[in-house]
A protein has these predicted regions:
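Catalytic, metal-anchored helix/loop core of enzyme active sites in primary metabolism
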Residues: 1-322
Length: 322
């Protein structure tokens, strides 16, 4: 959904963009439609069966079609301006690290890559002088709010969570739920994997870990707060008594658009009705209902091993569930 949203944004300003590369796993039909529309010459299709189907079709003989991300060195002859890395799961880490040296700016929407490989990503960003922008709505909001602000002024950062589809359900009722219920998020249109992570609240645990790594803030300065409407994306309390609250509509177009244009272009999107601010609802995150948030108290400050294991275990459980 991140990729489709970005494509739709670029369609509105097509004359100012040249897309050099598109990639997909199994959804090659959608990829080919996009490639045809934008006249994209380079495609990466990681699913072996999908790759063979396209490669053997003479209709696409004028395209450069690859099966893995080691082809970057063949595709890029100079640094491109912008890259979106939104490959789901830990498999997104390697291509994210590889692409950094070929791009001036990278927007990353892959939690697992940041959690498991931030040290490698950051080292690469510094080496190749590549600008980084987080695309998760919470991290983009924090990043935006902290521009030109010293980190030592921060007292606490609250990451908001909607509570997912089961906020009003008792823990007993959660013992018998199906895939459709789990993936039916009340506020966001997302893929099945991230919707499942949202329902269990492990998604928010991952976001706290991300924030710790990206903004170099200790876990004791980060907290989860339930905000069912999802209008507030981050709350930052400062030691000088002031608090910053970042509010925007529940539309991933907003962080994606601003990552692309660096907040220098006006967005054509649904404007937030400020009447909603009359009824903002905040609640504490209940560890009895969402026991996975207890994991945050177990995480050591200075190692990624536990976090990497957590990501791997969650990936496997979600795969088995779906």
């Amino acid at each position: 959904s991140i990729g489709k949203t970005l494509i739709n944004i670029i369609k509105q300003d097509k004359k100012n963009f040249e897309i050099v590369l598109l990639s997909a796993d199994g959804n090659y039909k959608q990829l080919l439609k996009q490639a045809k529309f934008f006249k994209v010459k380079n495609l990466i299709i990681t699913n072996q069966n999908s790759y063979k189907k396209v490669k053997e079709n003479r209709f696409y003989k004028n395209m450069n079609i690859y099966n893995d991300f080691s082809s970057f060195r063949k595709i890029f002859k100079r640094k491109i301006d912008y890259t979106m890395s939104s490959i789901s799961g830990i498999q997104g880490l390697k291509p994210t690290i590889e692409i950094i040296k070929y791009t001036k700016k990278i927007a990353i929407a892959n939690k697992e890559a940041i959690i498991c490989g931030w040290d490698l990503i950051e080292k690469r960003l510094n080496k190749h002088k590549t600008k980084f922008i987080p695309v998760d709505s919470e991290h983009f909001s924090i990043w935006y709010a902290l521009q030109e602000i010293e980190k030592n002024l921060i007292e606490k950062i609250y990451l908001t969570a909607s509570g997912g589809p089961f906020l009003g359900k008792s823990f007993q009722k959660l013992k018998k739920v199906n895939i459709k219920q789990v993936t039916n998020h009340p506020n966001w249109k997302m893929g099945k994997k991230i919707s499942t992570d949202s329902a269990t609240m492990i998604n928010k645990v991952f976001e706290v870990i991300e924030a710790k790594k990206i903004f170099k803030i200790s876990y004791n300065k980060l907290a989860i707060i339930i905000h069912p409407k999802s209008y507030v994306h981050a709350i930052i309390k400062f030691k000088n008594g002031l608090t910053k609250i970042i509010v925007h509509d529940t539309d991933m177009k907003i962080p994606i658009f601003n990552s692309l244009y660096s907040s220098k272009k006006f967005i054509n999107s649904k404007k937030l009705d400020f009447k909603v601010l009359n009824n903002l609802d905040f609640r504490g995150a209940n560890p009895k209902k969402f026991p996975l948030i207890k994991v945050l108290k177990m995480l050591p400050e200075n190692t990624s091993l536990f976090e990497t294991i957590l990501v791997s275990i969650n990936d496997k459980f979600v795969e088995l569930f779906l």
